[in-house]
Each structure stands twice: as C-alpha cells, then as structure tokens.
A protein has these predicted regions:
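Residue-level signature for tetratricopeptide repeat
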Residues: 1-2, 35-37, 70, 104-107, ...
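Structural motif corresponding to the intra-repeat A-B loop/turn of tetratricopeptide repeats
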Residues: 6, 40, 74, 108-111, ...
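Canonical positions in the second alpha-helix
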Residues: 18-19, 52-54, 86-87, 123-124
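Short coil turns that delineate tetratricopeptide repeat
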Residues: 23-24, 57-58, 91-93, 128-130
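Canonical tetratricopeptide repeat
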Residues: 32-33, 66, 100, 138
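Eukaryotic alpha-helical solenoid repeat scaffolds
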Residues: 94-203
Length: 203
C-alpha cells in the first residue's frame, strides 16, 4: 500500500502479482491488485482481476458491488445487472440494491428489462416505505418508456384497502410531490410537478 500511496500503481500491481504467484489464495493481494489496476485507469483489467477473485470469494458483497460499478463504467450493463443480482440474492431486503438494479435495467432499455425494472422500483418503494426518491422517479420514468414503446406494464401494487392498484407511476408521482412539499417547499415543487407531467405517459 506504500507504493499505492506514492502513486506507483504499476509497481504496486507487479508486487501483488508476485505475492499471488507465491500465494494464490492471498485474499488481500487480490483486492489490492484490483485497486492498483483501477488506479492506473485499467478498468477492463481490474474487472477481469475482480472476476477471478469473486470466483473464489463469492460471498464478498463489496466485491460484487465494485464489479458492478466497473461494468457500468465499461458500458457492460448486462454484466453489471448480473453482479447486482448476486447482491439481491444475498440481501433481498436492501431497497438500495433494488433501486440500483432497476436503474441498470432501465439503461438496458428493452421491453423485458423495463418491465423487470418496474418491478424492482416497486420493491424499493415498498421496502423504503415510500421514501426512496430515486425509485419513485424511476417508476414514473420507466412507465413512460414502456408506454412510448407500446409495451404493457405488468406491475401491480397493493392499495391501503387491500385492493390491487395498477397505477404505480401515478402513486409514485403523488408521493414525490408529497415528499418535496414536506421537505423542500417553495419554487422546487412546481418544477417537480412539471417534470413529472412531462414523464407521465399521455392518455
């Protein structure tokens, strides 16, 4: 780590390679090698090294999150989605990972990905008790994208009375206005309303 602190990334990576040649199961050397490669801007090599590491240390959630970030930076969103799926399998109650997964799927953008994104935005909204602003905006945006593409939505959420409510984007938009009214009143609320109106699919 002294070499890394001095910005000597290539020397650091070479050192970790020597350590791993002698001790392939050295967990710390694997992780520091990834950091050294990232420090050099070698994102593809860092992703490859991290993939090799995760083949052995599959329970390292921090590693899966980092690999997802690397894949996003490389424009490899389907690979990033796979990494986030590993996080969701480990901790399905983490609303932030549902939101992240949905955002990556929304970036992929085909109809199947958008429908799945909508389901995970709905899960994030439920798990966060309606306080995940990113998921709320995402639910509205994905519904608009589905409507624009002519694809149907498949998400149904439960209303307070126990009946099924299909208008997830409508509920999300209402909650967003409520949150901004409570926490950021003033000129921001009309801007939020205008943004939501622009996103809502025309009927």
């Amino acid at each position: 780590m002294v070499l890394e602190a001095k910005g000597l990334w290539e020397e650091a990576a070479a050192l970790y390679d020597r350590i791993l040649a002698a001790t392939p199961a050295h967990e710390g050397a694997h992780k520091r090698k990834v950091a050294a490669l990232r420090g050099q801007g070698k994102l593809e090599a860092a992703a490859t090294a991290l993939t090799t590491y995760l083949a052995t240390w599959q329970a390292d959630l921090e590693g899966w999150a980092e690999l997802a970030e690397l894949n996003i930076a490389l424009g490899q969103h389907r690979q990033a989605a796979f990494c986030i799926e590993e996080l969701l399998l480990a901790v399905p109650s983490a609303s932030m990972w549902h939101t992240w997964y949905a955002s990556v799927l929304a970036t992929i953008g085909d109809a199947d990905a958008l429908r799945t994104a909508q389901k995970h935005y709905a899960a994030a909204i439920e798990l966060s008790e309606g306080d995940d602003v990113r998921a709320l905006f995402g639910a509205v945006a994905v519904a608009a994208a589905l409507a624009k593409s002519g694809a149907s939505s498949s998400v149904v959420v439960d209303g307070e009375d126990g009946d099924s409510v299909a208008d997830l984007p409508g509920l999300a938009a209402e909650r967003l206005v409520q949150l901004y009214t409570q926490k950021a009143p003033g000129q921001l609320v009309p801007l939020v309303k205008a943004a939501l109106q622009a996103l809502r699919p025309s009927k």
